[in-house]
């Protein structure tokens, strides 16, 4: 049989995942990695090129061993990664510097760039690329020009982290639109670099690598890479892409108007746009999809999964111990407890992530509002359900913003990622949005989407879109409860009002924002999000 290998470089770990041509996962090799903080450089998060390549090779060998396959059984390889992370190379093609996705060292440079063109530069960048300056590559390049001119002068090429992995395997440098689009330097409409943006920023525009679409052949595994990784020299290496967009491919979300909520550490609400366009209010990010010619509106709920982990670890030691004794997941036990709490969680309002406002992106101080001292009504089960309801409310607010500028009317949504493992959470998401929610069998779909790209580039599949639709299968579908939907609409309106007041406390310096975008020096009150 033929098998495909996906290298999936996440924020916290690297995975090598092997699939057969029917999309069945055979084996995975995984290793955690850590990013490097540079002394006296606040917000820095450098990517350890040497150690992380060793870990990638370790994972490939581990996956091959676990699957009991030889290197000759792997017919094609593709790589995907977290977006925004960039790698710079010298003129010999050697990587000389890299940073991870949320490296925030360039706050001052973000603020400087916002001032050029009579304070219109960020709007001009967004109109062309769908990105703001907060996590784009240009402020980071400007920081290097200011503080590490030795690196900046040597830099001859820039790629994303997924492309670095592919280059380590094949010796070929190129970027794909889905991942390179997050640099803020790629034209959303032409799916090619926009050098004029770098010119306007006073940056060099001579380091832009070739652009190749996801699912096209890049090269082949070199002899050196074969010795290091355990793969066979000559194995095709295919262009991969950004993790979220490839995740959508793995979920079969490949047609205009289709919608997905990806529930991980962050929650992304992703909508395939009928035509390429940006949001006049600059609330929503717009990225190239891996499907050629298609763009995705993407909103982000901050730290949703991390908030649930914090709640579990800080307050639920007893439940964790019981779950361990029963051989079940602690979240499953907490969900079972929360299912006995009535919809609305007795009015408790969690204040964590705001709806997305890409241009003025910050959040209130974390808190719970409207608690009761009645232990029958306000307890761990109540707070856990309230957190699940709030995550769904923020998702619904974000989807409403996307619908407002795009004109897309949602018919259903796909719910995937770790959050979708909870049946209660899936039902709450359906109730809050008023939409049928489908949960796939393969919930961690990014690696599968990457494998589909690998197979397409090697000629094993006809095309990515039809293959994504064919390989996805559904675990369960949830339909909305009309009575709960009405209650949640009222809760959403109240939450938006309360959240705006909580932002006011941050603005006045009385509380500390959970997170704010780099370069956001002067916060301005943002109008409340539209209701779905």
Curated annotation (Swiss-Prot):
<keyword id="KW-0418">Kinase</keyword>
<dbReference type="InterPro" id="IPR033676">
    <property type="entry name" value="AI-2_kinase"/>
</dbReference>
<dbReference type="InterPro" id="IPR000577">
    <property type="entry name" value="Carb_kinase_FGGY"/>
</dbReference>
<dbReference type="GO" id="GO:0071518">
    <property type="term" value="F:autoinducer-2 kinase activity"/>
</dbReference>
<keyword id="KW-0808">Transferase</keyword>
<dbReference type="Pfam" id="PF02782">
    <property type="entry name" value="FGGY_C"/>
</dbReference>
<dbReference type="InterPro" id="IPR018484">
    <property type="entry name" value="FGGY_N"/>
</dbReference>
<keyword id="KW-0963">Cytoplasm</keyword>
<comment type="function">
    <text>Catalyzes the phosphorylation of autoinducer-2 (AI-2) to phospho-AI-2, which subsequently inactivates the transcriptional regulator LsrR and leads to the transcription of the lsr operon. Phosphorylates the ring-open form of (S)-4,5-dihydroxypentane-2,3-dione (DPD), which is the precursor to all AI-2 signaling molecules, at the C5 position.</text>
</comment>
<dbReference type="GO" id="GO:0005975">
    <property type="term" value="P:carbohydrate metabolic process"/>
</dbReference>
<protein>
    <recommendedName>
        <fullName>Autoinducer-2 kinase</fullName>
        <ecNumber>2.7.1.189</ecNumber>
    </recommendedName>
</protein>
<comment type="similarity">
    <text>Belongs to the FGGY kinase family.</text>
</comment>
<dbReference type="InterPro" id="IPR050406">
    <property type="entry name" value="FGGY_Carb_Kinase"/>
</dbReference>
<dbReference type="InterPro" id="IPR043129">
    <property type="entry name" value="ATPase_NBD"/>
</dbReference>
<dbReference type="InterPro" id="IPR018485">
    <property type="entry name" value="FGGY_C"/>
</dbReference>
<dbReference type="Pfam" id="PF00370">
    <property type="entry name" value="FGGY_N"/>
</dbReference>
<dbReference type="GO" id="GO:0009372">
    <property type="term" value="P:quorum sensing"/>
</dbReference>
<dbReference type="GO" id="GO:0005737">
    <property type="term" value="C:cytoplasm"/>
</dbReference>
């Amino acid at each position: 049989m033929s098998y495909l290998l996906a290298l999936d470089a996440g924020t916290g770990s690297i995975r090598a995942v092997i699939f057969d041509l029917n999309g069945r996962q055979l084996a995975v090799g995984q290793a955690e990695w850590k990013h490097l903080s540079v002394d006296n450089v606040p917000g820095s998060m450098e990517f350890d090129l040497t150690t992380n390549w060793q870990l990638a090779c370790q994972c490939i060998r581990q996956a091959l061993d676990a699957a009991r396959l030889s290197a000759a059984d792997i017919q094609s390889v593709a790589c995907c990664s977290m977006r925004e992370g960039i790698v710079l190379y010298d003129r010999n093609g050697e990587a000389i510097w890299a940073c991870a996705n949320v490296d925030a060292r360039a706050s001052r440079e973000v603020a400087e760039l916002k001032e050029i063109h009579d304070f219109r530069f960020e709007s001009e960048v967004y109109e062309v690329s769908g990105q703001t300056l907060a996590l784009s590559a240009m402020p980071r390049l400007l920081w290097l020009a200011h503080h590490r001119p030795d690196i900046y002068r040597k830099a001859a090429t820039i790629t994303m982290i997924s492309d670095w992995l592919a280059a380590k395997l094949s010796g070929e440098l190129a970027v794909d639109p889905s991942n390179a689009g997050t640099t803020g330097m790629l034209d959303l409409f032409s799916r090619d670099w926009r050098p004029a943006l770098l010119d306007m920023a006073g940056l060099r525009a001579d380091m832009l690598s070739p652009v190749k679409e996801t699912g096209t052949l890049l090269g082949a595994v070199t002899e050196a890479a074969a010795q290091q990784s355990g793969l066979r020299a000559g194995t095709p290496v295919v262009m991969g892409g950004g993790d979220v967009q490839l995740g959508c491919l793995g979920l079969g979300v490949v047609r205009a108007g289709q919608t997905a909520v990806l529930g991980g550490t962050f929650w992304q609400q992703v909508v395939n746009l009928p035509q390429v366009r940006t949001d006049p209010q600059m609330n929503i990010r717009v990225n190239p999809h891996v499907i050629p010619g298609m763009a995705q509106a993407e909103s982000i709920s901050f730290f949703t999964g991390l908030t649930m982990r914090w709640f579990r670890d800080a307050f639920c030691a007893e439940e964790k111990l019981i779950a361990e004794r029963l051989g079940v997941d602690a979240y499953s036990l907490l969900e079972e407890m929360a299912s006995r709490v009535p919809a609305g969680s007795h009015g408790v309002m969690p204040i964590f992530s705001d709806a997305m406002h890409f241009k003025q992106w910050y959040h209130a101080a974390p808190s719970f509002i409207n608690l009761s001292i009645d232990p029958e009504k306000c307890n761990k089960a109540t707070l856990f359900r309230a957190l699940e309801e709030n995550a769904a409310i923020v998702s619904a607010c974000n989807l409403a913003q996307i619908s407002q500028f795009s004109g897309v009317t949602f018919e259903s949504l796909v719910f995937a990622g770790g959050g979708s493992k909870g049946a209660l959470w899936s039902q709450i998401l359906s109730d809050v949005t008023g939409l049928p929610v489908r949960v796939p069998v393969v919930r961690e779909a990014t690696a599968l989407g990457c494998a589909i790209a690998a197979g397409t580039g090697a000629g094993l599949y006809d095309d990515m879109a039809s293959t994504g639709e064919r390989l996805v299968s559904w675990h369960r579908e949830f339909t909305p409860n009309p009575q709960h939907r009405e209650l949640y609409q009222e809760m959403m309106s109240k939450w938006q009002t309360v959240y705006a007041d909580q932002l006011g406390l941050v603005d006045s310096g009385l509380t500390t924002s959970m997170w704010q975008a780099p370069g956001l020096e002067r916060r301005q009150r943002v109008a409340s999000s539209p209701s779905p």
